[in-house]
């Protein structure tokens, strides 16, 4: 490996690597998986050089393996990210991201009049995609929102 292509972020022995996250999205993904509250070592790479994206974010969490269902939630933020499960420094499984049909109890509804804000119910959105445009429809108020509108709100 030449100096120019040397790893900028240390390899992990066991755990999960989420790579090819668009720049400035890594922190949102960190919070989505609650990694910032983990007792395990988390390595964060922000604005790393990428030939495909220009710049990218990267997350590595040791001794934690993200499920396929969790990885699919990632598709909202980074549909082209890669999720690799590592054992003994080797990639043992690559998770393909698919947009889930429904996402529950992750995001708050942007509609301040929605009953999900005042009733003891979990937020729930049905997802749809057309021409790389992801839309979320609230189960309760039935309003449709752009992905960016829903994912910018703290639940």
Swiss-Prot record:
| One Gene Ontology term of the molecular function aspect | metal ion binding
User: Which GO annotations describe the biological process of this protein?
Assistant: 'de novo' pyrimidine nucleobase biosynthetic process; pyrimidine nucleotide biosynthetic process
Per UniProt, which keywords does this protein have?
Metal-binding, Pyrimidine biosynthesis, Zinc
Q: Is Metal-binding among this UniProt entry's keywords?
A: yes
Show the InterPro entries listed in the entry.
Asp_carbamoyltransf_reg_N, Asp_carbamoylTrfase_reg, Asp_carbamoyltrfase_reg_C, Asp_carbatrfase_reg_C_sf, Asp_carbatrfase_reg_N_sf
| Cofactor annotation | Zn(2+)
Q: Where does Zn(2+) bind?
A: 109, 114, 138, 141
Q: Which residues form the signal peptide?
A: none
Gene3D superfamilies recorded:
Aspartate carbamoyltransferase regulatory subunit, C-terminal domain, Aspartate carbamoyltransferase regulatory subunit, N-terminal domain
One Pfam family of this chain: PyrI_C
> Which is a Gene Ontology cellular component entry for this protein?
aspartate carbamoyltransferase complex
Glycosyltransferase listed as a keyword: no
The cofactor remark states: Binds 1 zinc ion per subunit.
Similarity section: Belongs to the PyrI family.
Q: Which HAMAP family match?
A: Asp_carb_tr_reg (MF_00002)
Q: Quaternary structure per UniProt?
A: Contains catalytic and regulatory chains.
What this protein is reported to do is described as:
Involved in allosteric regulation of aspartate carbamoyltransferase.
Name it.
Aspartate carbamoyltransferase regulatory chain
User: What broad taxonomic lineage does this protein's source fall under?
Assistant: Bacteria, Pseudomonadati, Pseudomonadota, Gammaproteobacteria, Vibrionales
What is the gene name?
Answer: pyrI
